[in-house]
Design a protein with these regions (language model features):
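Gly/Pro/Ser/Thr-rich low-complexity, intrinsically disordered segments predominantly at protein N-termini
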Residues: 1-190
Length: 190
């Protein structure tokens, strides 16, 4: 009978991750993101996923003066740099560094094949860094889940409130003017 042994692991820092990119260890062909010190493979974006991200980006740009970043990194020091599908961030240039938690007002993840990962890994990660609101677009389930008001203790991080909306309209709980017609969102999707 064999027993699993917990081996010590080295968590990569955001600096380590950036050096791996700069030196060519990681390239544009490597579809990974840094989550809690680990390099996590990202599923390639299929046409449906890409369409939902583009549609959401287009709609959001008409509703806010915030900068709408599509599939671009946000830095969550010291060991995470996820690439959310959409990040609504403070409207300024990010020439020297990717947005930090204090710059991010809302994140949207489009989950066509990544629902479990997004809900069990990314939502708590975003809560830990006090991202005010997160939406998960559940493509297969035909719903949008909204999480807001991060609640962080020494033991865990989660959102104090959540709701799941399948029809009609979902409205941001933290950013005035952000609304999404789910009937329009699901038009043309399978």
């Amino acid at each position: 009978m064999s027993t699993a042994i917990a081996l010590p692991r080295h968590k990569l820092s955001v600096t380590d991750y950036h050096q791996m990119i700069t030196t060519g260890i990681l390239t544009g062909e490597d579809h990974v993101e840094l989550i809690d010190g680990d390099l996590i493979e990202m599923a390639p974006a299929g046409p449906e996923h890409a369409d939902f991200v583009a549609y959401l980006g287009r709609i959001l740009r008409t509703q806010t003066v915030l900068l709408v970043r599509e599939e671009k990194p946000v830095t969550l020091p010291e060991h995470s740099e996820p690439e959310p599908d959409i990040a609504l961030v403070k409207p300024r240039r990010y020439l020297e560094a990717h947005p930090y938690p204090e710059d991010v007002l809302m994140i949207i993840e489009v989950a066509d094949t990544s629902l479990d990962k997004d809900k069990s890994v990314k939502v708590p990660l975003y809560a830990r860094f006090r991202i005010p609101e997160v939406w998960i677009v559940d493509v297969q389930g035909g719903a949008v889940e909204s999480f807001w008001e991060p609640w962080v203790t020494a033991e865990f991080a989660q959102y104090a409130h959540s709701k799941r909306v399948e029809r009609d309209v979902i409205t941001s709980e933290t950013i005035p003017g952000i609304t999404l017609s789910l009937n329009e969102l699901w038009k043309g999707s399978t």
